Structures are given as C-alpha cells and as structure tokens.
Amino acid sequence: MSIPIRADQLRSRYLAFFSQKAHVVISGKSLVPEHDPTVLFTTAGMHPLVPYLMGEPHPAGTRLVNAQKCLRTGDIDAVGDNSHLTFFEMLGNWSLGDYFKEEAIAFSFEFLTGAPWLGISPDRLSVTVFAGDEAVARDEESAAIWERLGIARTHIHFLPRADNWWGPTGETGPCGPDTEIFFDTGVPPCSVSCRPGCSCGKYVEIWNDVFMQYRKDADGRYRPLERYCVDTGMGIERTVAVLQGKRSVYDTEIFTPLLERIGQLCGKRYGCQGAHDVSMRIVCDHIRAATFILGDPVPVRPSNVGAGYVLRRIIRRSVRHGRKLGIDGEFLSSLARVVIGQYAAVYPELEEKATCIAQELANEERKFLDALRKGEAEYERMIPKFLQGTEREIPGSVAFRLYDTYGFPLELTEELARESGLRVDRAGFDTAFQAHQACSRIGAQRVFKGGLADHSAETTAYHTATHLLHQALRVVLGTHVQQKGSNITAERLRFDFSHPRPMSAQEKVQVEQLVNEQIRADLPVCCEVMSLEDAMNSGAVALFGEKYESTVKVYSIGTFSREVCGGPHVARTGQLGRFSIQKEQSSAAGVRRIRAILEKSGEKS
C-alpha cells in the first residue's frame, strides 16, 4: 500500500489542518540562528521556539504551526546511504500552555487517518509511550488516549527513557515524556521481538509528540510545571518516502529533478546501485543544503570557521564526488538552479539571492577544483608508502599539509583514507594545526582585542571611523557584509569584511562619500550598557562567532550605526577629519580588505 502524496501537498495539508484547529501559521525562522551562539544551524522545528516553550509569551498566541528549514551536520559522513540528509524540512505544531495530551494526540490521529488529510489506515500505525522509571510514572494517560482513538493495544508499546523522553537540554529545566508514531511498511518482522524502534525497516517513525510537563531540579527531582506545553515534529522528506512506499528518500519527487540533472552531467543513470549512486546522493544532498545556506536571510559564506566551514566542507565534498562521477569543470551552479526552481514558491528568498548563490558556488568551486586536482595527485603519489606500513595510518603532519597547501578539510582526507583502507592520525593533525596557529601569532602580540594597537586619540578616532565604514559597506554592498577582522593604529585602519567579489570604483566612491557625510554631520557617539539579548533585539550589529558577556556596551553613531563594542570612541564624528580609502583588495576567500586613512584639515592623501 502506498499513499500518493507529494511533499508540497503534505506541507500545505498540515498547515491547513492545524489552521482549522485554531492554530496560527507562523513563518519559519532563519536556517542560521541569529541570537544563539551555541549552535551553528537550526537543527529542529522547536529550536526557534525554545524561549516560548520556556515561558515567554508568543505574540501570535498559544496555538502555533509552521514548516521550518533545518540542517544537521553530525552525520555528514553518513550522507550517501538511502536515508541520511543534512538539510530537511520539519513540520510542527505547538501548544504553549493551551491544550495537552488529549487534544495533541487526537490532532495527530485525525490528521494521519482522516480522509481529507492523509487517510492512513489505523492498522498501519503503531505508537510508543514512556514506560516509566523510578523518577517518573509510566505514561498510562497517553496509552489510554491512543486506545480510545482506535489504536489496538497490541500496537501500543511502552519504551524506556532512552526512547520516549525529551530533555532537559541541560542539567535542569523543562522536560517530559513523548509519544512517537510509526508507520508499518508492511515488510515481514525481523524476529519475534521486532517492534517500533527496531532498525530492520519494518517500522518507520513519522511523528513525535513531546509533552513538557515536568521540571528537573538541581536535586534530581521532577516537579510538575505550572504551564504544560506540547512540541511536535514531522519530517517532510521521510514521511513522504514512507507514504509513497519508497525504499529511500532519494526515490521521491523531492530529489528526482536533481538526480536527473546530475545524471545528465555525468552520463550515468541513478538507480544502478554501487559507488555511482552513493556519489550522486552525496552531491544531491550537499548542493541542496549549500543552496539553502547561501540563500538564507542570515548571510553565511564559505570560510574556515563555524557555519562557513560546514558550508565549505559540503561544497568541496560535492566537487570531489562530482569528479568521481566524471563531471569535469564547474557544475554546482546549474544544480543550485534546480533547487531554487523547486522551492522558490515556498522560500522566495532563494530566487531573490539566486545570483549571489551562483557566484558563491562558482567562486568556491573554481578555487577548489585546481587545488583538488593537485591535492589528489599528491595524495596518490604518497599513498603507497602508507599502504605498505604496518599501522596503515596517514600521519597528522601529512593531513595538515594537505589542509594547509591544498585546502583539504581534515574530513576530506579522512574520506580518501577510508576509501584506501587507511585512517588518519587526528591527534597529530591537531598538534600540527596548533603549532601553525602559534607561529601565526608571532608578531601580532601587540594588537589588543578589537584590533586596536593602543588607545591614543588618533587610534580612537580610527576606531570610530571603522564603525562608520562597516555600516557604509552594509548600506552600499548589502547586509551580507560582516566584519571579519580589523587592525587599527594611529596612522591608518585596516578592515576585513565578507564580500564575494572586488568592489567597483563606483562602490568605493559611494562608501567613501557615505562615511564623510556622517563625519560632516558631526553625529553624537553614545554608549549604552545593556544585556546582550536587549542589544541584539535593538538591532545592534555584533561580530559573528564572538563570545560576549551577558552585559555589553552598545555604541550608537546618531541613527546611522549601532554596534556591540567595548570602545573607546570619540564623542562626535566631526572630530575625525576626512575619510579616504587607500586600497581595497582580497584578504582571503570571500573576504575583502580595505585600508583607509583620516586626513586632518590641510592634508591630502
């Protein structure tokens, strides 16, 4: 039995169903959390709603529903099999102190089995509930609700905390039991003990309802919360595959257009199994993820740190597997166009940023292709001696040389090594990397945090000018511009910022003029002390990846610029003199560098 439902139908029906149940459809949030430094990407539908699940009132009310873009990077190396994905969409409905188990479970059952919605026979469903332990009682309430709705008692399974309990995220906090809903694929059971949660493939989880009803305290006790919440999640890709009777998410219409395009580029047909299918799935998943990251409202560019490193890694892994398939030359931009065409109606920001997405992919691909050819040749040259060794290990120093010289992420070298039956000395790589960092710091010890060489009047003036420059770049080039570094002395400023291409002569003139307009306006420079949360909510710009204290200083220059900063700054912009850009050049991949000076009255550059 299969249910012919497409991904777009599942998404629209889910939102429509819960709208009828008095839920407010809220928009999904950015794939890159703006105010949560603990994670690189939004990993679940509930992630953006954590403050509201913890008690903060949501402006849209107490019943919410949405579709959320998510990205998980823990299993990147597993991508290539039939099921693993990095990017996926999560459907979710929430009750913030409104309904609880009775209504939540009834809603799930009605959507899954109701004829206007999915129309699944209740006989194909099995559920799991919390079995209880010494700390919290067995969840008989959820089991009884399922049975009243029509799920046979033999299809209700009590599982331990490891399977049916959520939270807390730390040592203390909100938590509670959950109930998971599984679809019976119809394949024979693997054994007499086969049940939901078994890895044989007979049962596939399609929905999870989490009931936050307890708080775990520091003494280890669980106490009832004053306000109960419900958090649910259904992955679109997996659910569509299961309902369509497909053995793999990659066999659905979600991925077919991409796989067909990859097949056209490499001259191979997907579905013949073997290494080619694995590489096609890797390219398919990774270009989909990269397109959504690059198209996100919060800008991320390929780099060697944080979210940028994940982006660089999946792009470069795509390039390598494209070469394994026989694709010669650049190809990622054409695949991104397929992704954009599929999703632009739901996520219009992809079409809006299509040119930027294509440029970033082309730049990264072009840069890596040459290095990949040389690096693979170097790897093939040296690999025989490691294959002959008894340890069958690539030294960390060699892995670091591939990273430093050819831009091979450590994970790429490890992937090459696995294909050759080798392993990589990770500890040795870390040692070589740390030694390289130590050498890079020599000669830079005099620079204070924030890039200031001293706190003289001249250096302070350049510091304020840097804030004006940063905002001017964001106005002229776009809000994707982020500060990547600065070095400020009493003679000049040097400012590194994210931007995929050289600035045009006109853009440099516009930036220079905009900065000088603010200087001529003699704007006041004001400092406020506030919580980091208040600072971010007020629109202050902060350095991506920087670790801030809970209380920060925010410097505002009139209404033109507002940044989280430790200072010092001048009192008014009229003290700066004339701003002049001396040079604009590349600093690193996707990073530009400006050198500028301040001219006092009578000076000329």
UniProtKB/Swiss-Prot annotation:
The record describes how the cofactor is bound as: Binds 1 zinc ion per subunit.
Give the keywords, sorted. Answer: Aminoacyl-tRNA synthetase, ATP-binding, Cytoplasm, Ligase, Metal-binding, Nucleotide-binding, Protein biosynthesis, RNA-binding, tRNA-binding, Zinc
Which BP terms does GO give this entry?
alanyl-tRNA aminoacylation
Pfam families, A to Z: tRNA-synt_2c, tRNA_SAD
Give the reaction(s) catalysed. tRNA(Ala) + L-alanine + ATP = L-alanyl-tRNA(Ala) + AMP + diphosphate
Q: Where in the cell is it found?
A: Cytoplasm
Single GO cellular component term: cytoplasm
CDD domains (alphabetical): AlaRS_core
Family of the protein in this entry: Belongs to the class-II aminoacyl-tRNA synthetase family.
What does the entry's domain section say?
Answer: Consists of two domains; the N-terminal catalytic domain (in this organism this is shorter than usual) and the editing domain; the C-terminal C-Ala domain found in most orthologs is missing. The editing domain removes incorrectly charged amino acids.
Write the protein's name: Alanine--tRNA ligase
Q: Which organism is it from?
A: Treponema pallidum (strain Nichols)
Give the gene that encodes this protein: alaS
